[in-house]
Protein backbone atom coordinates (compact mmCIF):
# COMPACT_ATOMS: atom_id res chain seq x y z
CA UNK A 1 0.00 0.00 0.00
CA UNK A 2 1.30 3.46 -0.94
CA UNK A 3 2.38 5.70 1.93
CA UNK A 4 3.72 9.24 2.17
CA UNK A 5 6.41 10.48 4.55
CA UNK A 6 6.67 14.16 5.46
CA UNK A 7 9.86 14.89 7.44
CA UNK A 8 9.20 17.87 9.74
CA UNK A 9 12.03 18.72 12.09
CA UNK A 10 11.33 21.31 14.76
CA UNK A 11 14.88 22.54 15.25
CA UNK A 12 15.51 24.68 12.18
CA UNK A 13 18.26 27.20 12.91
CA UNK A 14 17.55 29.72 10.13
CA UNK A 15 13.78 29.92 10.66
CA UNK A 16 12.78 28.60 14.09
CA UNK A 17 9.74 26.29 13.94
CA UNK A 18 9.56 26.92 10.18
CA UNK A 19 7.18 24.01 9.60
CA UNK A 20 4.60 25.74 11.81
CA UNK A 21 5.17 29.27 10.48
CA UNK A 22 1.94 30.88 9.28
CA UNK A 23 1.80 31.13 5.50
CA UNK A 24 -1.35 32.83 4.30
CA UNK A 25 -3.37 31.72 7.30
CA UNK A 26 -2.07 28.15 7.68
CA UNK A 27 1.01 26.52 9.15
CA UNK A 28 3.46 25.64 6.36
CA UNK A 29 3.21 21.94 7.21
CA UNK A 30 -0.56 21.97 6.70
CA UNK A 31 -0.16 22.60 2.95
CA UNK A 32 1.88 19.41 2.54
CA UNK A 33 -0.55 17.39 4.65
CA UNK A 34 -3.58 18.61 2.70
CA UNK A 35 -1.90 17.88 -0.64
CA UNK A 36 -0.92 14.37 0.43
CA UNK A 37 -4.36 13.57 1.82
CA UNK A 38 -5.82 14.13 -1.64
CA UNK A 39 -3.93 10.97 -2.59
CA UNK A 40 -4.02 8.73 0.48
CA UNK A 41 -4.88 8.64 4.17
CA UNK A 42 -1.57 6.84 4.71
CA UNK A 43 0.36 10.03 5.47
CA UNK A 44 3.09 9.98 8.11
CA UNK A 45 4.91 12.94 9.62
CA UNK A 46 8.30 12.25 11.17
CA UNK A 47 9.20 14.72 13.91
CA UNK A 48 11.03 15.05 17.20
CA UNK A 49 9.09 18.20 18.12
CA UNK A 50 6.17 18.06 20.59
CA UNK A 51 4.44 21.11 19.09
CA UNK A 52 4.61 19.69 15.56
CA UNK A 53 3.43 16.32 16.87
CA UNK A 54 0.40 17.92 18.56
CA UNK A 55 -0.47 19.83 15.38
CA UNK A 56 -0.18 16.70 13.23
CA UNK A 57 -2.29 14.67 15.64
CA UNK A 58 -4.94 17.43 15.60
CA UNK A 59 -5.19 16.84 11.85
CA UNK A 60 -5.60 13.07 12.43
CA UNK A 61 -2.35 12.27 10.65
CA UNK A 62 0.07 9.51 11.66
CA UNK A 63 3.12 10.62 13.64
CA UNK A 64 6.45 8.85 13.70
CA UNK A 65 8.39 9.94 16.74
CA UNK A 66 11.83 10.71 15.43
CA UNK A 67 14.75 9.99 17.75
CA UNK A 68 16.83 13.04 18.69
CA UNK A 69 19.83 11.52 16.91
CA UNK A 70 17.88 11.95 13.63
CA UNK A 71 16.93 15.56 14.38
CA UNK A 72 20.38 17.12 14.38
CA UNK A 73 21.76 19.74 11.99
CA UNK A 74 23.76 17.04 10.22
CA UNK A 75 20.91 14.49 10.04
CA UNK A 76 19.95 13.57 6.50
CA UNK A 77 16.64 12.88 4.83
CA UNK A 78 18.00 9.43 4.00
CA UNK A 79 18.44 8.74 7.73
CA UNK A 80 14.84 9.78 8.34
CA UNK A 81 13.62 7.59 5.46
CA UNK A 82 15.52 4.62 6.88
CA UNK A 83 13.86 5.17 10.26
CA UNK A 84 10.45 5.47 8.56
CA UNK A 85 11.00 2.14 6.79
CA UNK A 86 11.93 0.50 10.11
CA UNK A 87 8.66 1.75 11.63
CA UNK A 88 6.18 1.39 8.74
CA UNK A 89 5.55 -1.59 6.49
CA UNK A 90 5.39 -0.44 2.87
CA UNK A 91 6.70 -1.34 -0.57
CA UNK A 92 5.91 1.99 -2.19
CA UNK A 93 6.32 5.40 -0.59
CA UNK A 94 6.93 9.03 -1.36
CA UNK A 95 8.80 11.73 0.57
CA UNK A 96 7.18 15.17 0.49
CA UNK A 97 9.04 18.15 1.91
CA UNK A 98 6.84 20.44 4.00
CA UNK A 99 8.73 23.44 2.63
CA UNK A 100 7.05 23.04 -0.78
CA UNK A 101 3.58 24.52 -0.19
CA UNK A 102 2.83 24.81 -3.91
CA UNK A 103 3.35 21.13 -4.65
CA UNK A 104 0.51 19.83 -6.78
CA UNK A 105 -0.80 16.37 -5.91
CA UNK A 106 -0.72 15.49 -9.62
CA UNK A 107 3.08 15.65 -9.47
CA UNK A 108 3.02 12.91 -6.84
CA UNK A 109 0.55 10.86 -8.87
CA UNK A 110 2.74 11.22 -11.98
CA UNK A 111 5.73 9.91 -10.04
CA UNK A 112 3.71 7.01 -8.66
CA UNK A 113 2.61 6.10 -12.16
CA UNK A 114 6.23 5.93 -13.32
CA UNK A 115 7.08 3.48 -10.56
CA UNK A 116 3.87 1.50 -10.27
CA UNK A 117 3.08 1.42 -13.98
CA UNK A 118 4.59 -0.63 -16.77
CA UNK A 119 7.89 1.26 -16.76
CA UNK A 120 10.82 -0.30 -14.96
CA UNK A 121 11.71 2.54 -12.59
CA UNK A 122 12.30 1.81 -8.93
CA UNK A 123 12.57 5.45 -7.88
CA UNK A 124 11.83 8.92 -9.18
CA UNK A 125 12.65 12.43 -8.03
CA UNK A 126 11.06 15.70 -9.03
CA UNK A 127 13.29 18.52 -10.14
CA UNK A 128 12.88 21.91 -11.72
CA UNK A 129 15.27 23.84 -13.88
CA UNK A 130 16.76 26.82 -12.13
CA UNK A 131 18.19 29.73 -14.07
CA UNK A 132 20.75 31.79 -12.18
CA UNK A 133 23.00 34.55 -13.41
CA UNK A 134 26.37 35.00 -11.76
CA UNK A 135 28.83 37.89 -11.54
CA UNK A 136 32.42 37.81 -10.34
CA UNK A 137 33.70 39.96 -7.48
CA UNK A 138 34.30 42.85 -9.90
CA UNK A 139 30.74 42.78 -11.23
CA UNK A 140 31.63 41.09 -14.53
CA UNK A 141 29.05 38.55 -15.77
CA UNK A 142 30.26 34.95 -15.51
CA UNK A 143 27.60 32.89 -17.30
CA UNK A 144 25.91 35.45 -19.58
CA UNK A 145 26.63 38.55 -21.66
CA UNK A 146 25.36 41.96 -20.62
CA UNK A 147 22.66 43.09 -23.02
CA UNK A 148 22.20 39.51 -24.24
CA UNK A 149 20.51 37.89 -21.25
CA UNK A 150 17.36 35.88 -21.88
CA UNK A 151 14.22 36.74 -19.98
CA UNK A 152 13.04 33.89 -17.75
CA UNK A 153 10.04 33.14 -19.98
CA UNK A 154 12.41 32.64 -22.95
CA UNK A 155 14.17 29.70 -21.28
CA UNK A 156 13.07 26.18 -22.15
What are these model-derived regions, one by one?
Residues 4-6, 45, 95, 123-126:
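Structural beta-sheet core signal
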Residues 79, 101-156:
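Conserved core of the sugar-phosphate nucleotidyltransferase
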Residues 2-47:
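N-terminal glycine-rich phosphate-binding loop and ensuing alpha1 helix
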Residues 9, 68, 97, 128-129:
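Histidine-centered beta-alpha loop that forms part of the nucleotide-sugar donor binding/catalytic region
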